[in-house]
């Protein structure tokens, strides 16, 4: 693809559905399925780190689990995924693609998880260290987003 000067082309490059088909054929496992599997592993890691008292890691993997689930569902629904780490934007795009209404609680949780992308990765990104309450909120929000997505698809 040739760059035409449109900055959006860099941040949200087109991913034609045909490319997903080529990748599926090459990898042997559907791309969406690969996103789901990794999302499930990250969800398990979020719980594991929470149980071990590793709260920043629990929040990091909760955010990642939601991101991977949503990317997989977007690929499944539309044939592509946007280039963003915003759980809020991903869930909003998915619900729009499905013609479903995004509940306020899910939107709030998606925004909360989005904030964890930077805060949980870098020790100097937050004023306060992560604690048990933070990790519980991350896990609750992951469960809320996950449950809402699966309910909407069923």
Specify the residue positions occupied by each region the protein language model found:
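Terminal alpha-helical segments
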Residues: 2-154
């Amino acid at each position: 693809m040739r760059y035409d000067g449109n900055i959006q082309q860099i941040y949200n490059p087109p991913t034609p559905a045909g490319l997903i088909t080529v990748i599926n054929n090459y990898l042997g496992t559907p791309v969406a399925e690969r996103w789901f599997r990794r999302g499930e592993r990250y969800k398990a890691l979020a719980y594991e780190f929470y149980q071990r008292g590793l709260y920043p890691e629990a929040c990091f993997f909760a955010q990642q689990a939601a991101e991977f689930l949503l990317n997989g569902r977007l690929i499944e629904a539309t044939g592509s995924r946007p280039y963003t780490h915003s759980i809020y934007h991903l869930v909003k795009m998915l619900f729009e693609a499905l013609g479903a209404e995004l509940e306020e609680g899910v939107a709030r949780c998606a925004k909360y998880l989005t904030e964890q992308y930077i805060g949980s990765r870098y020790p100097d990104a937050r004023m306060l260290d992560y604690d048990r309450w933070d990790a519980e909120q991350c896990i609750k929000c992951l469960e809320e987003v996950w449950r809402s997505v699966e309910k909407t698809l069923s």
